[in-house]
C-alpha cells in the first residue's frame, strides 16, 4: 500500500506540508498504523510486581524502556480496558507510550509544588502523583470545564490525593510568579500524533489550526515560565510534528526570557530537531529538544523540551 497516497485522499494539504518535514515511506506508514496498546501500573494503588503478575495472567507485557519500570506495552491489539477489573480499580492507567515521556523528563519529587497547566484527561497528572508518592501538591488545570470533569474522574480512580483541579485559561498562572518547583505544559496542539488513534485528526487538520495553536502555545509557555521558581524545571510537550508548534515555540521563549534548555538522555530513538523552517531560523539550542516521529519508536509523534529557569 502507498500510505502517502492514502493520506492524500484524506487531506492533501497535510501531506503537502509534512512531506517537507519527513518524506520517508516509514513516516507515512507508521502514521497510518494503529498504536500498540500501552499502560502504566499505578503504584499509588498497589504493588508493582503483584499488579504485573495479575496482568500477565491475561496478556503478554513488554516493558517501555524510557519509563521508571511502570510502563508496559500489551502485546495484543484486542484490549477492552473497560472490561478489566484492574482498570476499574485504578491499578492500571491506559496511556500512550510516548506520552509517558514528559513526566519522566520533569521528574517531580515528593513534597514539591507542581503546575500541570493543561492537565486533562489526566494520565500525566496521575503519573506525576505516582512519582511524588502522593506527597506535595499538583495544581491540575484545564481551560474547559467538561474536560476538567473527566480529569477529576481519572484522578479519583487512580487514588491521587494531592491534586487540586482548577478551570482557568493557562495564562492565568502568570500572576503566580516564581511559585512552582516544576511546571508541565503539555500544550493543546494540532494533534498530528493522534492520527494513529483516529483518522479524524487527519481529516480535520488545517494550517489554520497550526497557526492558532502556535499563538496559544507562545502565550502559555511565557505564563508557565513566569510561574516557575528560579532553579525550577519547565517541560514543554506536544503530540504533533509541526515546527511552528514545537521548535518555534521554544525558540520564542529563549528570545523573550533568560530560559536555558537542557539536553535529555533517554533510551529512545529520535528525529533531528528542526533548525530552519519556511525561512525561519531557530537557535541552535533547540537541538537539545526531543523530536519523535511515529516510526522512531512505533509510538505517537511527540515533542519534548526541558527548560530550566536560572537561579
Curated annotation (Swiss-Prot):
Substrate specificity and tendency to aggregate are influenced by archease. S-adenosyl-L-methionine binds at residues 118-124, 142, 169, 186. Keywords: Cytoplasm, Methyltransferase, RNA-binding, S-adenosyl-L-methionine, Transferase, tRNA processing, tRNA-binding. Gene3D superfamilies: Sun protein, domain 3, Vaccinia Virus protein VP39. GO terms for cellular component: cytoplasm. Transmembrane segments: none annotated. Its EC number is 2.1.1.-. GO terms for molecular function: tRNA (cytidine-5-)-methyltransferase activity; tRNA binding. It catalyses: cytidine(49) in tRNA precursor + S-adenosyl-L-methionine = 5-methylcytidine(49) in tRNA precursor + S-adenosyl-L-homocysteine + H(+). Its main location: cytoplasm. Signal peptide: none annotated. The active site is at 239 (nucleophile). It is found in: Cytoplasm. One of its GO terms (biological process) is tRNA methylation. Pfam families: Methyltr_RsmB-F, Methyltr_RsmF_N. PANTHER family: 28S RRNA (CYTOSINE(4447)-C(5))-METHYLTRANSFERASE-RELATED, NOP2 YEAST -RELATED NOL1/NOP2/FMU SUN DOMAIN-CONTAINING. Belongs to the class I-like SAM-binding methyltransferase superfamily. RsmB/NOP family. Catalyzes AdoMet-dependent formation of m5C in tRNA. In the presence of protein archease, specifically methylates the cytosine at position 49 (m5C49) of tRNA. In the absence of archease, catalyzes the formation of m5C at many locations in tRNAs or rRNAs. Forms a tripartite complex with archease and tRNA. Binds only the oligomeric forms of the archease. This is tRNA (cytosine(49)-C(5))-methyltransferase. It comes from Pyrococcus abyssi (strain GE5 / Orsay). The lineage of its organism: Archaea, Methanobacteriati, Methanobacteriota, Thermococci, Thermococcales.
Amino acid at each position: 500500500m502507498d500510505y502517502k497516497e492514502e493520506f492524500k485522499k484524506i487531506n492533501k494539504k497535510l501531506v503537502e506540508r509534512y512531506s517537507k518535514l519527513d518524506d520517508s515511506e516509514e513516516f507515512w506508514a507508521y502514521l497510518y498504523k494503529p498504536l500498540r496498546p500501552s499502560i502504566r501500573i499505578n503504584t499509588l494503588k498497589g504493588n508493582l510486581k503483584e499488579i504485573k503478575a495479575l496482568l500477565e495472567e491475561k496478556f503478554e507485557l513488554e516493558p517501555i524502556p524510557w519509563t521508571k519500570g511502570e510502563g508496559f506495552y500489551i502485546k495484543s491489539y484486542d484490549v477492552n480496558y473497560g472490561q478489566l477489573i484492574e482498570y476499574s480499580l485504578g491499578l492500571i492507567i491506559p496511556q500512550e507510550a510516548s506520552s509517558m515521556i514528559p513526566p519522566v523528563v520533569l521528574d517531580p519529587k515528593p513534597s514539591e509544588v507542581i503546575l500541570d497547566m493543561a492537565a486533562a484527561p489526566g494520565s500525566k497528572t496521575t503519573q506525576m502523583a505516582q512519582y511524588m508518592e502522593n506527597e506535595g501538591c499538583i495544581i491540575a488545570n484545564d481551560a474547559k470545564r467538561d474536560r476538567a470533569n473527566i480529569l477529576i474522574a481519572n484522578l479519583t480512580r487512580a487514588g491521587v490525593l494531592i491534586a487540586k483541579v482548577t478551570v482557568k485559561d493557562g495564562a492565568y498562572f502568570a500572576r503566580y510568579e516564581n511559585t512552582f518547583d516544576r511546571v508541565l505544559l503539555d500544550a493543546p496542539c494540532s494533534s498530528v500524533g493522534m492520527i494513529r488513534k483516529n483518522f479524524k485528526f487527519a481529516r480535520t487538520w488545517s494550517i489554520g489550526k497550526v497557526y492558532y495553536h502556535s499563538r496559544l502555545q507562545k502565550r502559555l509557555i511565557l505564563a508557565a515560565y513566569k510561574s516557575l521558581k528560579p532553579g525550577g524545571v519547565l517541560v514543554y510537550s506536544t503530540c504533533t510534528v509541526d515546527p511552528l508548534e514545537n521548535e518555534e515555540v521554544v525558540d520564542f521563549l529563549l528570545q523573550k526570557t533568560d530560559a536555558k534548555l537542557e539536553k535529555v538522555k533517554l533510551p529512545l530513538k529520535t528525529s533531528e530537531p528542526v533548525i530552519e523552517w519556511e525561512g525561519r531560523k531557530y537557535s541552535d539550542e533547540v537541538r537539545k529538544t526531543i523530536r519523535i516521529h511515529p516510526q522512531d519508536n512505533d509510538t505517537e509523534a511527540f515533542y519534548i523540551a526541558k527548560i530550566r529557569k536560572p537561579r
